[in-house]
């Protein structure tokens, strides 16, 4: 017996032939909805409540029209940022100019990514579940699809969850919490326990007026809906040029060695090119200052400019102190390598601690570092 969804689909398509253009597209969309209401009802429900449905953006606009029955599911196209760009070009261009678009490249660039259990890498709850927001090449997409990792290719749906694709959802700090939490990136814990986050929660509970100031992640990092998310300080708060403070410059150089960007002699390595490609660090004063100025302007909407500048300088000073502690730890472990107490792993380029191995560092003391 033929699949009833297939029979329904063909019958509706036959009727669609009577109406050209938009009417035909609408009939085809109705066929998708009728079939998927029995298979994936919540997907249909989300779409029906979306701005897409309200504006008559049908299933085939994102998934194509080749998939017509349960027997040809593989013909359904999976959305990518380019799909979204057909209507949201400005937002996709902004996204690709920001750090979120580089998340996939950053995950693949780490030296021990391939060491991780495949269940961790391929699952939605593992590292790549969040890093999948990054832009991917056509070849990378094909490889992921071949492994059955086809969800989340659109990147946009990391924040605008499919198939509602809600701007309201993506405008909430809870959308950011999905990835920006935990011991290795505790931004949610810092925000929710700070004054900004507390006021946002009080406002949500109705304890504050709806027009009360309660800055969210998006308020400060996506002003006016700009999707080009970027910060002044990069990964591990490393940037160039080196500071004028000689001690701080020396400590920063040690950290760059620990990141493998410089070799133990202080000379640039091939990793510097990866840092440039993934924009892991701000590599000029001009680039750093641009982001700092933008943040001061944002803060000044609620605070005096002098207050904003002073608080940001306090943060800079905290980084200076933390750099000193980090550099001391790196030099201590480097000394253990130099004295032969720790042996150089075969996969290491130098007898020197590698910070990018994170929890995969070969010794307990390095893991603590």
Question: Where are the regions a protein language model picked out?
Answer:
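Bacterial N-terminal signal peptides
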Residues: 8-17
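Positively charged n-region of N-terminal signal peptides that target proteins for export
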Residues: 1-6
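Short sequence/structural segments immediately N-terminal
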Residues: 22-369
